[in-house]
Amino acid sequence: MVEEKKKKDKESKYAYKKKSAWEVFTKDQIKKAFDFCEGYKKFLDTAKTEREAITYINEKIKKTGCKIFINRDKEAAVVVPGEKPVAEGVRIVISHIDSPRLDLKQIPLYEDTNSNVALFETHYYGGIKKFHWVVTPLALHGIVVKKDGSKIVFNLGEHPGDPVFSVPDLLPHLSYKVQDVKKLDEAITGESLDIIVGSKPAKGDFSEKIKTALLDKLYKEYGTSEEDFISAELEAVPAYKARDMGFDRSLIGAYGQDDRACTYTSLRAIMDIKKPRYTAIAFFVDKEEIGSEGNTTAQVTTFLRSIIKKLDPHVDVDNVMLKSKVISADVNSAVTPNYTDVFELKNASTLGYGVVMSKFTGHGGKYSANDASAEYVAEIRTLLNKNKIPWQAAELGKVDNGGGGTVAKYFSRLGMEVIDLGPPVMSMHSPYEIASKVDIYSAYLAYKAFLES
């Protein structure tokens, strides 16, 4: 009977079976992964907005001697010259530095006389589940640009002793008719995602005493008037710190791992390469979460073209791009317990099995997708296997079950070879996403191997 069972458990030597990173990595590599993620957690706590990410990247690169190009404080490219001339193409790893959040409206402050609190009006950014954002401790990050052009930097709610902010919710005793019987995506509306910012009234004969007190406080502490909010970019983000998760500390829970997991790993990768064969570029772009619209995004090719011309004024930029190869460094969804029926499990990614290679994204019949060529998929697969980097192949959910996109399609339109490659993340687009330390480290190794290839 035992012999018979052994025979049944055997698989063809030609069968594909993805391997756990915990089994592929040596004990020393697992230790390196854990050590690597200590820096990653600090990055997540430091860079919760796109501007903060660029500031962090710039400060790190200044110490290395690498070239860095910055566009409007929201987009950057780090360059390491290669042995081959730029005319023969470049190697690019591109990630996005924005994450879903609550943005303040241009005229945000108001006083609610029924509840006697003051609030900021918000407009959510990116694809969120609105119910995630109520009763979540929030910090306020961003800048206010005054009429004289001077900038005031906000970062309130992150440090010990700082106040935090929150979107209030209704108690379950009274929520039945207005929330409980509604669809999940209708119970909390976008207009209700206003954050409480104060309740102490000013002394004196004012029509809105709480609002008046807060405007006075903001002017005294920051020198801002209400009109200054019109030229501000203020973002309410989760005040949570990145933390180890699980008894074994194998996971990381944090806000913004989509896509700062790829931002940090690609930054570290380009900082750690010495003399690549081809010129290596780590690209960091904004506004991917809202379709890459704007002048600091992957859709705008002017910045990339200007960089190529600065590297070599004599090249034909279009020809360089035709010869270039790209990794679109973005996360994929990890199979989620209790919701496995939305995934086609043979073609889904799981935590702890390494970096995820996605040949295509999009939705339905592969609409709005970059579909990487079989030749390029084979090239990346060979690179990962050669360097013994744990990886898995996956797409986002079952066919016709939804879908998503990345910046891959924008760079492929320039004639480049592009494929999506990034770590799996659970609870994506929530205020507290989950990733595996070995997957984060696998992404770093993959980007480093690619940039050196």
Language-model features: locations:
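N-terminal hydrophobic/helix-forming segments and targeting peptides
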Residues: 1-453
